[in-house]
Amino acid sequence: VSFNYYWRVRANDSTGYGSYSNVSNFTLNSLLSISIINGTVDFGNLGLNGQANTTASGNISPFRLENNGNINANVTIYATNFFNSTDMPSVYYQFKIRENESGAYNNATTFFNWTNMTNVTGTIAVFDLNWTALANDFFTDIRVLVPPEEPATVKNSTVTFEIAS
């Protein structure tokens, strides 16, 4: 969504106007760019049926992303499976979007309630993420609940954030 700007000028010396200059222009190229400010969520140790989330646990920081481009962006979120004993999507692995700055995105269509994490792309979770400096970032909170049949091992998941205009 690049923009072409055209202009021309003419001078005034208080007695009259001169001729218009030739038309000049410049192009403002669109930049679609997101920075990950916090890219790691660590829940520590959780036992069987244990649960944790980044909104209730004050010492666990959520993902934080910022639009540092110059156009609004849509963000799709998906991840690899966190648990071995359950398929995705499930209530055992969820996310929700939260504004860090008021007016950062379209509240009517953004996933601000707990939503089951999926392992396929295609569902936009953040709509119209603003690019202006005072309202351009958001948190992605994560909630996990250890399934009853889950074996005790180290768990991890890769969360992917895809952007588009």
Say what each PLM segment does.
Residues A11-D13, E101:
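Sequence-pattern detector for short linear motifs
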Residues N29-S165:
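Signature of Gram-negative chaperone-usher
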Residues S14-L28:
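Extracellular fibronectin type III
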